From Swiss-Prot:
Residue ranges the record marks as coiled coil: none
Domain of life: Bacteria
The encoding gene: secA
Name of the protein in question: Protein translocase subunit SecA
A GO MF label: protein-exporting ATPase activity
InterPro entries: Helicase_ATP-bd, P-loop_NTPase, SecA, SecA_CS, SecA_DEAD, SecA_motor_DEAD, SecA_preprotein_X-link_dom, SecA_SF2_C
Biological process per Gene Ontology, one example term: protein targeting
Species per Swiss-Prot/TrEMBL record: Synechocystis sp. (strain ATCC 27184 / PCC 6803 / Kazusa)
Role: Part of the Sec protein translocase complex. Interacts with the SecYEG preprotein conducting channel. Has a central role in coupling the hydrolysis of ATP to the transfer of proteins into and across the cell membrane, serving as an ATP-driven molecular motor driving the stepwise translocation of polypeptide chains across the membrane.
């Protein structure tokens, strides 16, 4: 009704941006006529215009003015370097991103190319643009591939990957445009705020950020805080004992499992049984606490399942990301939970960790003055994106209309029947020759369907978090659209390679060149990391994915399965390929490049960009020849697959979020291709079991049907949608709560990090310490002297003793020196005395080495900030866990948390001040003996 009256708000937004697109198109003809050098010179002209800006607002105005011409320049560079021209809808996407909004673009509409437009425009300011993807592979691919446009136009392009040392990170963050992942960005921010000298800081002030798969990072990952932790010793035998006890406790009798809240509650019988087994009287005994260990052991037993939430690899428990299905090497669950799972699996129990620094993605990305993002599916979460991040969602139209068919869901009574039906559908469509993609929600489920297909003799590829499959991810996806291909994938969200019907000839040709080239020119991995990296990793907290986890070097191989290629290359082409590789070795040297450098060369060779490197030109020639040979078959196969109906996507369980279901569906029917999707469900699926409630169970009894008979009913589909909406609302509330509580921490974090940065930059630390000292003296006076009482009742003697404890250089002061001063006069007197004492202290310290006092000031302030902030984080965590109980006393827990958290923060700031003053006055440096 409202739409009819006011028109669709999305259409209104697009209408507002349309004039920009028209202007870009007007520029196109003139810009086509420019030579390469003239095109590159446009960057210089744009920068000169931006140099005139005197404020951020003026900069934005100039960016809007030059936008049409700048976009036309990028479009032309794209044609020349990559052979790709931005469609009008891609220009629209670029404008939406530049305006700090979220562009919703369907799969296959070229999101990666869209990002080049706003990143070039905003990169012109020189303040840095961060393009964020969900994993290292995609960041590297985009930096190598799309980065060619920016490099051609004269902008610098950086790439930050796990495993890089601080110098490399700093250099890459200093570039105009930096490609990286959300976790690298977040951990670098936290590490920068733990560094002890400006030279260690790797990031610049934040400016503009474009997030690819924005919903995955800002919504799915929002509940996960980024944590850098140090190790604490805890007795491992307690974890093992707790695990044995949990194994003897029974659900419903000794404890209840709340799957919705992912929590366990022990019953009175449970407490009695555990105490009896432990031969103790109180699980909460302060001197020998057991409750925490037992709770974690039960959680590990009931809520964390092997091959679903984690896998065991090389004797280690490795987390599986529930949203992407990828393994998260180096990440650990906190609060002793990871140790409880290690005890359950009987692998080596690693040390427990203590939080040193933490931030949630929600608050991290809000640090950017301008934020934008791209995704295929954001409309379902529009309210949250607008409320939390102040980001509007604008849907861009597709370049070609979609011709995908979404068939209705079929529901079976139990899982076994569902899996059989999935296998049967695969068999039928496979016989027709249609490519099929089966999406599963866990490693375990993907292996169930894999076994069923094996027993039917259907050849298929498996893509899940198991390491042997991860390595081949891009190869598997590149051929998932070939005739008769069957691919099983765990949580397909965010898999960066498109499924092209008939197979991806460009990618296959690149794989073939890589097979021959890489073993000859890439340096073996042992030489890859210099001592600098290792030293840094051990000196600072180890971020995820650093180094090899079990010390054994895996020999890298570039061989791929011969089945991947549509045909074997001709002898003539193979000879040409061998010659090109030999030429590369002659020019670069045998095994002389890092893998990143080699991938970079190959990326340029696989495109059309201008280059003077004779090796790249030779490789490009052979790459194009291989591609042409493959294309003969892939284009014929493309036609065949289109006639058969395109890719068929099978979903095997509704995800907690409709958005992830839509992402899976979006794999079929890209760029106007035909395709179809269907979901196979069972009443035993998690979503229905946990959130469907009694309604679904009632429906199940109504349908007195055979096990293998599918149920199709509008009522049931309605219940499913309802369950999903319930889950989405439930998780939205959790994220909102995380956000509200973390907002309290965020304000404190900003204050403490700003203070830390001021100290790091060393802006007049002496004056800062003197202010600390004066405030400390004021607090001592206020503690012992009450101005409302007569002077004879003032405790002047103890006040003096306390002042001397802090500043021993005041030891000559006596009660008589204070005479009959007023409170204000006493404070002024102490201010003067403490300044004199500090000058005296400085003279003593600087005798040992000139300038030592300045170093000591920085060292002690940073040391106190870090130590007390670390303790404060633990206290705030404890407060947060206990504050929920206030709700029972008719008090709002959030308001109580804000109030108490603020008081604790003020106390911490006072402690920092006092400890710094005390430490500096107690500091007694030793004179270094002179070398003879």
């Amino acid at each position: 009704m409202l739409k009819a009256l006011f028109g669709d708000p999305n259409t209104r937004k697009l209408k507002k941006f349309q004039p920009y697109v028209a202007e870009v198109n007007l520029y196109e003809e003139d810009i086509e006529k420019l030579s390469d050098d003239e095109l590159k010179y446009k960057t210089v002209e744009f920068r000169e215009a931006l140099d005139k800006a005197r404020s951020d607002a003026e900069t934005e105005e100039i960016l809007d003015e030059i936008l049409p011409e700048a976009f036309a320049v990028v479009r032309e560079a794209g044609k020349r370097v990559l052979g790709m021209r931005h469609f009008d809808v891609q220009l629209l996407g670029g404008i939406i991103l530049h305006k700090g909004q979220i562009a919703e673009m369907k799969t296959g509409e070229g999101k990666t190319l869209v990002a080049t437009l706003p990143s070039y425009l905003n990169g012109l300011t020189g303040k840095g643009v961060h393009v964020v993807t969900v994993n290292d592979y995609l960041a590297r691919r985009d930096a190598e591939w799309m980065g060619q446009i920016h490099r051609f136009l004269g902008l610098t392009v950086g790439l930050v990957q796990s495993g890089m040392n601080p110098e490399e990170r700093k250099k890459n963050y200093a570039c105009d445009i930096t490609y990286t992942t959300n976790s690298e960005l977040g951990f670098d921010y936290l590490r920068d705020n733990m560094s002890t000298a400006m030279i260690e800081v790797v990031q610049r002030p934040f400016n503009f950020c474009i997030i690819d798969e924005v919903d995955s990072i800002l919504i799915d990952e929002a509940r996960t805080p980024l944590i850098i932790s140090g190790q604490v010793e805890r007795p491992t035998e307690k974890y093992l004992q707790a695990s044995d006890i949990a194994a003897q406790l029974e659900p419903e009798i000794h404890y209840e499992v709340d799957e919705k809240q992912r929590n366990v509650l022990m019953t009175d019988e449970g407490f009695e049984k555990a105490e009896q087994l432990l031969q103790t009287t109180d699980l909460f005994d302060k001197n020998d606490p057991w409750a925490h260990y037992i709770f974690n052991a039960i959680k590990a037993k009931e809520l964390f399942l092997k091959d679903v939430n984690y896998i065991v690899r090389n004797g280690e428990v490795v987390i599986v990301d529930e949203f992407t299905g990828r393994i998260m090497v180096g990440r650990r669950w906190s609060d002793g939970l990871h140790q409880a799972i290690e005890a359950k699996e009987r692998v080596e129990i690693q040390k427990e960790s203590q939080t040193l620094a933490t931030i949630t993605y929600q608050n991290f990305f809000l640090l950017y003055p301008k934020l934008s993002g791209m995704t295929g599916t954001a409309k379902t979460e529009e309210t949250e994106l607008e409320k939390v991040y102040n980001l509007q969602v604008t849907i861009t139209p597709t370049n070609r209309p979609s011709s995908r068919q979404d068939w209705p869901d079929v529901v079976y009574k139990n899982e076994e029947a569902k899996w059989k039906a999935v296998a049967l559908e695969c068999e039928e469509l496979h016989q027709q020759g249609r490519p099929i993609l089966v999406g599963t929600t866990s490693v375990e489920k993907s292996e169930v369907i894999s076994r069923l297909l094996q027993s039917s003799g259907i050849h298929h590829n498996l893509l899940n978090a198991r390491p042997e499959n991860v390595e081949r991810e891009s190869e598997i996806v590149a051929q998932a659209g070939r005739k008769g291909a069957v691919t099983i994938a765990t949580n397909m969200a965010g898999r960066g390679t498109d499924i092209i019907l008939g197979g991806n000839s460009d990618y296959m040709a690149r794989l073939k060149v890589r097979e021959y080239l890489m073993p000859k020119i890439v340096r073996p991995e042992d030489d890859e990391l210099g001592a600098g990296v290792t030293g840094w990793v051990s000196g600072r907290e180890k971020p995820q994915g650093f180094g090899n986890q079990n010390g054994k070097k895996k020999v890298k191989t570039w061989q791929v399965s011969p089945d991947i290629y549509p045909t074997t290359i001709s002898q003539e082409t193979e000879d040409l390929l061998k010659k090109a590789v030999k030429f590369a070795v002659d020019q670069y040297g045998l095994q002389s490049l890092t893998e990143l450098e080699a991938e970079d060369k190959l990326a340029i060779a696989s495109e059309k960009g201008p280059t003077d490197d004779p090796v790249i030109l030779k490789l490009r020639e052979v790459y194009n020849q291989i591609r042409r040979e493959y294309e003969v078959l892939t284009s014929a196969e493309h036609k065949e697959v289109v006639e058969l109906g395109g890719l068929h996507v099978i979903g095997t369980e509704r995800h907690e979020s409709r958005r992830v279901d839509n992402q899976l569906r979006g794999r079929a029917g890209r760029q106007g291709d035909p395709g179809s999707t269907r979901f196979f469900l069972s009443l035993e699926d998690n979503l229905l079991r946990i959130f469907g409630g009694d309604r679904v169970a009632g429906l199940m009894n109504m349908f007195r049907v055979e096990e293998d008979m599918p149920i199709e009913s509008k009522m049931l589909t309605g219940s499913l949608e309802g369950a999903q909406k319930k889950v989405e609302t439930y998780y939205y509330d959790i994220r909102k709560q995380v956000f509200e509580y973390d907002e309290v921490m965020n304000n404190q974090r900003k204050a403490i990090y700003a203070e830390r940065r001021r100290v790091l930059e060393g802006l007049d630390l002496k004056e800062q310490v003197l202010v600390y000292a004066e405030k400390t003296m004021d607090e001592i006076v206020d503690a012992y002297v009450n101005p409302e009482l007569p002077p004879e009742e003032w405790d002047v003697e103890n006040m003096l003793d306390k002042a001397k404890q802090f500043v021993y250089l005041l030891e000559d002061l006596t009660v008589e020196d204070l005479g009959d001063m007023t409170v204000w006069e006493m404070k002024t007197f102490f201010h003067e005395e403490v300044r004199k004492a500090y000058d005296l202290k400085e003279t003593q310290v600087d005798k040992v080495r000139p300038g030592l006092m300045r170093e000591a000031e920085r060292y002690f302030i940073l040391q106190q900030i870090d130590n007390l902030w670390r303790e404060h984080l633990q206290s705030m965590e404890a407060l947060r866990e206990s504050i929920g109980l206030r709700g029972y006393g008719q008090k709002d827990p959030l308001i109580e948390y804000k109030q108490e958290g603020y008081e604790m923060f003020l106390e911490m700031m006072i402690d920092i001040r006092r400890n710094v003053v005390y430490s500096l006055f107690q500091f007694q440096p030793q004179q270094q003996p002179q070398a003879v």
